[in-house]
């Protein structure tokens, strides 16, 4: 009996039905929107919805993209902020944690693979291109920025440095809490990034099953994460 009551309470009070109906039918073709793939929890702020949302998945279903639920048992229920001027391509199941911020600039493209999880209080700021592969998990308070926000000049070479550089995170990456993934970061598949690390370069030649740690991050050991339900 308790389970049924709890389920009813969750449906009524936890799910943000105004946001669910508004966002799905505003941003998706009717045949997709009617399935309500976007599921919003608690508070959400739509700062800008001028961009495009493209779901590239044949199995679109109710609640496949969950926004604002992850981490709600641990952190204050601050609103998720959605700021989409550019294009967000979604290839599968996606979770965005409570209190997170998603920004995609007008000329930018954010691509997220299947089974991508952004933890609570994550900040993703896409000014050019951010690509996240399949089965990626970000812990809480991470930031993913493909921009420095300002131009800078190398005084030795007199060269103006690039402000924006793409980010590409490989599949089966696990990113610990409070990591900073900065512009130019590229990782191979099957990499762990230890908590409080800063990544800011191309790590594509790094062997799979490496652990990156530090600021800036470097390889410290080789280890494999076991995914519940897959490896255990």
Put a short name on every predicted segment.
Residues 176-177, 195:
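Conserved beta-strand->loop/alpha-helix structural units within folded catalytic cores of enzymes
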Residues 194, 213:
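Alpha/beta-hydrolase-fold catalytic nucleophile elbow
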Residues 154-158, 224:
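Short acidic, glycine/proline-rich loop/turn micro-motifs
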Residues 1-145, 166-172, 179-181, 189, ...:
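Domain-scale signature associated with acetyltransferase and cell-envelope carbohydrate enzymes
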Residues 185:
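Short beta-to-alpha loop/turn elements within the nucleotide-binding domains of ABC transporters
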Residues 150-151:
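Short helix-loop boundary/capping segments
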Residues 158-167:
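A short acidic, glycine-rich active-site loop
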């Amino acid at each position: 009996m308790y389970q049924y009551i709890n389920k009813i309470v969750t449906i009524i009070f936890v799910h943000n039905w105004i946001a669910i109906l508004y966002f799905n039918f505003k941003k998706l073709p009717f045949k997709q929107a009617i399935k309500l793939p976007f599921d919003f929890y608690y508070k959400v702020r739509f700062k800008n919805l001028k961009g495009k949302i493209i779901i590239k998945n044949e199995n679109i279903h109710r609640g496949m993209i969950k926004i604002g639920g992850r981490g709600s048992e641990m952190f204050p229920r601050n609103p998720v902020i959605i700021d989409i001027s550019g294009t967000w391509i979604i290839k599968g199941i996606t979770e965005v944690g409570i209190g997170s911020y998603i920004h995609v600039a007008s000329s930018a493209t954010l691509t997220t693979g299947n089974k991508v999880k952004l933890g609570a209080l994550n900040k993703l700021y896409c000014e050019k291109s951010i690509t996240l592969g399949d089965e990626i998990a970000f812990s809480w308070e991470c930031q993913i920025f493909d921009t420095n926000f300002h131009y800078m000049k190398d005084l030795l070479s007199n060269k103006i440095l690039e402000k924006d550089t793409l980010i590409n995170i490989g599949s089966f990456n696990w990113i610990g809490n409070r990591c900073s993934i900065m512009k130019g970061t590229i990782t191979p598949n099957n990499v762990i990034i230890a908590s409080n690390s800063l990544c800011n370069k191309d790590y594509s030649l790094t062997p799979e099953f490496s652990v990156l740690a530090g600021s800036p991050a470097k390889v410290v050991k080789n280890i494999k994460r076991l995914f519940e339900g897959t490896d255990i």
